[in-house]
Amino acid sequence: MDLVVDLGQSGARIKIDNQISQLQIAKLTTDSVVETLEKIFKLLPQAQYSNVFLSLTGLLGNVGDVAPYGKLCEKFFNADQVFVMDDGLAAYLGALGEKNGVVLTLGGGVVAVAGNNGKFGHADGKGQIFGDFGGGFWVGQQGLRRAISTLDQRDDAHDLVKLLSAELESHSKLQNKTGVDAATLCISAAKTVIQGAENGVTSAQEILKTAAKFLGATVIAAWSKVSDNTQEKPSITFLGGLSRSDFYTDLIRQEINQKLNCEYV
């Protein structure tokens, strides 16, 4: 029996044989990857798994010393083999296989992984404090910041106050407005901001247009790390929950198309 754990910044997906489930345990800045995995493993069936496959956020393309992962899987599952991969690279191989191009993953965070004839490059994936512009945390944070500033009479985004009324109520109830729950609220608010943009909310559209500029630059940066040949035509694909919005991905395509001749798959 095999176990697959896909750990991201907005949650974790678990696959045990052919059964797939979700856990609301995400990689946050307060815990290491190993600490987060231990929280997840404590909630899983304590069976013996022959193979454990770990697709992990926060590795920045370098899995480093795999011994801590092996020890953890041996402790909980007595696993025979443990396979560890950066989640961005895993996404690339799953989406493009042997094609040359860029995979932009839009979840709670952001990472672009480019591949060209066996050479790989990353852009962004720097986490919520130093990067991940255009990801779920960033989009939701921008929306809530402007709405809160409007309530404080420092801004005039009244359309966002109306749009994010439920999230603002949740914000008012937070005991710690700089902790894990606050970060989770930002990520969940991104969906509301995107829906608002799709429905014509001007301030929400402004947020996504700015985000798309960042994301376009992220894709270009990733590709430039593996190719300086302007004649090459890379394949581009988008993954992650935010990529389900055609409105958002169309904005990102517009930014990419200004600087890169590519095809979308």
Locate predicted features.
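ATP-binding/phosphotransfer module of carbohydrate and carboxylate kinases, centering on a glycine-rich
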Residues: 1-51, 97-102, 144-265
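Short glycine-rich anion-binding loops that position phosphate/pyrophosphate groups of nucleotides
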Residues: 10, 57-59, 108-111
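Short beta-strand-loop/turn "lid" adjacent to the catalytic site in phosphate-handling enzymes
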Residues: 44-83, 95-96
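Short, acidic/small-residue loops that bind anionic groups at enzyme active sites
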Residues: 78-86, 131, 262-264
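Conserved phosphate-binding catalytic cores of ATP/NTP-utilizing and phosphoryl-transfer enzymes
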Residues: 79-104, 119
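Glycine-rich phosphate-binding loop of actin/hexokinase-like ATP-binding domains
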Residues: 99-150
